[in-house]
Amino acid sequence: MCGRRLLFLAAFGCLLANAFSLPATRNEEFDDGFPESEFDYEERHTREIPAQAYAPPIVYNSQSSYSPAKDQGYSAPAAPVYSPAAPSYSAPAAPSYSAPAAPSYSAPAAPSYSAPAAPSYSAPAAPSYSAPASSSYSAPAAPSYSAPAAPSYSAPAAPSYSAPASSSYSAPAAPSYSAPAAPSYSAPAAPSYSAPAAPSYSAPAAPSYSAPAAPSYSAPSAPSYSAQKTSSYSAPAAPSYHAPAAPASSYSAPAGPSYSAPAAPSYSAPSYSAPASSYSALKAPSYSAPAAPSYSAPAAPSYSSSASPSYSSPASSSYSAPAAPTYSAPKAQSYSAPAAPSYSAPAAPSYSAPASSSYSAPAAPSYSAPAAPSYSAPAAPSYSAPASSSYSAPAAPSYSAPAAPSYSAPASSSYSAPAAPSYSAPAAPSYSAPAAPSYSAPAAPSYSAPASSGYSAARAYSAGSAAPASGYSAPKTSSGYSAPASSGSPAASSYSAPASSTASSGYSAPASKSSGYARSEMDHQILGMARTAGGYGSAAPSAAYGAASLPSPPCPKNYVFSCSSVFTPAPCSQGYGY
């Protein structure tokens, strides 16, 4: 054993001496048995033969430990046997990390992340919120809540929401909710809005607005709500739905008289019902345009008054603030940024899950729960008081908090975190390259369009947001999603850097690493392999490689001398000293 080790050390020393005393032949360290002309660097270079094919051992044995073996016939294996190791470990580096990134995360991105986005999040939106809105909230809207629709939501509805408002929600609006407004919604609160609450807005609240919140309201977000986001729901949210916040007492007492009148002039929201069906189609044109003019103005006068305490406070803090900070900012940071980074990609997983957890949860617990218990019960016993305490408080804490913390945090923590860590890492390898092949393809057909146009528009959307300056633009730029982008250094490193950093080091490196091995490493006495190796199994690539931030464990000192090192690539970091 001792003799063998001594021989090995002697060979090692000889190799080192040769390596440093014969720099001209440094590229022939592992080709003792071959003529120099066949393996000299220049010829290799001209023939475009990757350096890995000749100097792979260096990857693990910094050219010395494995070299001596080469001398004794272990050398031959070194070149051929360990050489494959190089190609193996080298090629894998390129194809493995490269291809996996593209195909692995790409394919999943496309079918898994893409399809979900479209069918899962999209479909629900249409059927869930559409149908419910139509049958559940629509029907009630017509007879019960119709009047408001006519005068109030009619005008706003004019372009997009108009038709629904007109025919569906308009006609009913006049007779039904018009007169009822005072008597109806007052007393109706119990009978009129109560009953509707149960069948119309109540049931809808739970099934329609509740479920929709997650599935339905989610999908609309992408196609319909996305477009609207900028013009319609964004601006409205702040000015329109916020203004409602003002009429605190209005919605409280108004429940009877106030909500009655408002009902007429603006249950913009009412249209929100009919739109359900519309909300699908309308989503883009209808809810979009209406959102701005219709839902916006209505929000102020109609739902505004009422909104104040009940829906207003909500509007302000809850649905209003949300609108501006939450639903507006969300749009910017949450719904907006999402639109771009978040909602685009998230749409499927992120916004999908968020939709459930973030927007869904809020929607469900916040807007849903409130809708059912708060908006439902209040409707019956009192839309007035509930409006104030019930829908107001819920709105404020429930939809407000969700909006800010929930929808914001989601954007930041929930939506951001996903974006950063979850979507970030993917963003790098997955979303970066995949973005092109994987998420791009999906993006194109499934969510890419949104990602591309949507996501690009998201950028434009940001501009669009700019239109809704503070509500939409600021939030966007603000910390909501910018922070994620920023704090979402993930966004920067995760989402932006991923593309950049990943594309650069994580993704680009692999690609470049290949040729880097061939040229750079050979040129730099092959010892530079450690650098690339470091890049390969170290932090950045590590994170990018496995979408995990845990770096590979360092190889044991004797790894290079084990059999597995010859036949299989090292499952550990090949740093300096190996």
From Swiss-Prot:
Key words of the record: Disulfide bond, Extracellular matrix, Secreted, Signal
Disruption phenotype: No effect on offspring viability; function may be redundant with that of other eggshell components. Dramatic increase in embryo dorsalization; when combined with mutation of pip.
Key word Repeat present: no
Localization in the cell: Secreted; Secreted, Extracellular space, Extracellular matrix
Chain residue ranges for the region called 45 X 8 AA approximate tandem repeats of [PS]-[AS]-Y-S-A-P-A-[AS]: 72-452
Primary site of residence: secreted
Signal peptide residue numbers: 1-21
GO molecular function, one term: structural constituent of vitelline membrane
Record's comment on post-translational modification: Becomes part of a disulfide-linked network including other vitelline membrane proteins, including Vm26Aa and Vm26Ab, during vitelline membrane biogenesis and maturation. Sulfated by pip; probably involved in embryo dorsal-ventral axis determination. Sulfation by pip may occur on covalently bound glycosaminoglycans.
GO cellular component terms given for this protein: egg coat; extracellular region; vitelline envelope
Gene Ontology BP terms: dorsal/ventral axis specification; vitelline membrane formation involved in chorion-containing eggshell formation
UniProt keyword annotation of Disulfide bond present: yes
Record-annotated VM domain positions: 549-578
Expression (tissue specificity): Secreted into the perivitelline space and becomes stably incorporated into the vitelline membrane (at protein level). Expressed throughout the follicle cell layer of stage 10 egg chambers.
Stretches the record annotates as Disordered: 133-442, 487-514
Assembly with partners or alone: Interacts with Vm26Aa and Vm26Ab; forms part of a disulfide-linked network within the vitelline membrane of stage 10 egg chambers.
Function comment: Major early eggshell protein secreted by folicle cells into the perivitelline space and incorporated into the vitelline membrane. Localized sulfation by pip may be involved in embryo dorsal-ventral axis determination.
PANTHER family: GOLGI-ASSOCIATED OLFACTORY SIGNALING REGULATOR, PERIAXIN-LIKE
Protein's UniProt name: Vitelline membrane-like protein
